[in-house]
Design a protein with these regions (language model features):
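Structural preference for beta-strand elements that scaffold enzyme active sites
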Residues: 25-26, 63-69, 101, 106-111, ...
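Surface-exposed, active-site-proximal loop segments in enzymatic domains
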Residues: 36-40, 72-88, 118-127
């Protein structure tokens, strides 16, 4: 999350070497990283990981599980891509750029960083503005990911900062239409933050 902002490329490579030498094999990033990003530095974290992957070679890359995420709308990050949504154009562009940045032929786990629809998240309470134009598109999103999986560009899909309703909808659509099933939920969850339990 900090490679490219708080950490230089050399520091990032050293930290990755240190982690892998001690048995870490799961690397989680996102197209929007580093945190505190802007139009000049977004994607730096993926690029630093990519230059490190290029350095260690293809045989070592196969031992890693690399996860990255597509940014959703409503966070003031239009510098990433316009429109910032989960349309076929947007998802395809995001995957292609992440593959290029990460210098890899495939992404092991590709997640939606937060839902496309407006909802309470990131500590927000009480949605102030409902987007009445948003149309439910769980089936369409899964169909897009199905195509990318068949092309070999991603292996698995997941969600992040999602609520139980969204998880249920994705699972229901995947079962109903024989589409890829989400394999991960990356949500904040601790003794101090148990909001995900509310909808269960």
């Amino acid at each position: 999350m900090t490679f490219g902002n708080q950490n230089t490329e050399i520091e990032a490579h050293n930290q990755l070497d240190y982690a892998v030498e001690r048995g870490i094999n799961f690397l989680d990033t996102a197209e929007m990283y580093p945190i505190g990003g802007n139009a000049q530095i977004f994607g730096s974290t993926e690029r630093f990981i990519g230059s490190w992957i290029n350095k260690i070679g293809a045989s070592q890359r196969e031992k890693l599980v690399i996860a990255t995420k597509i940014a959703g709308p409503n966070r003031g990050m239009e510098y990433i891509r316009k429109p910032l949504d989960f349309s076929k154009k947007s998802i395809t562009e995001a995957v292609e750029l992440s593959l290029k940045n990460l210098q890899t032929d495939y992404i092991d786990l590709y997640q939606m960083h937060w839902p496309e629809r407006v909802m309470n998240m990131f500590g927000q309470r009480g949605v102030s503005k409902i987007d009445t134009n948003w149309q439910e598109n769980f089936f369409e999103v899964l169909t897009i990911f199905d195509g990318l999986i068949k092309e070999g560009k991603i292996k698995h899909i997941g969600v992040s900062n999602e609520n139980p309703y969204g998880v249920m909808k994705f699972i229901n659509e995947s079962e109903k239409h024989n589409l890829p099933r989400i394999v991960s939920i990356q949500n904040p969850y601790s003794l101090l933050n148990r909001l995900f339990e509310v909808g269960l």
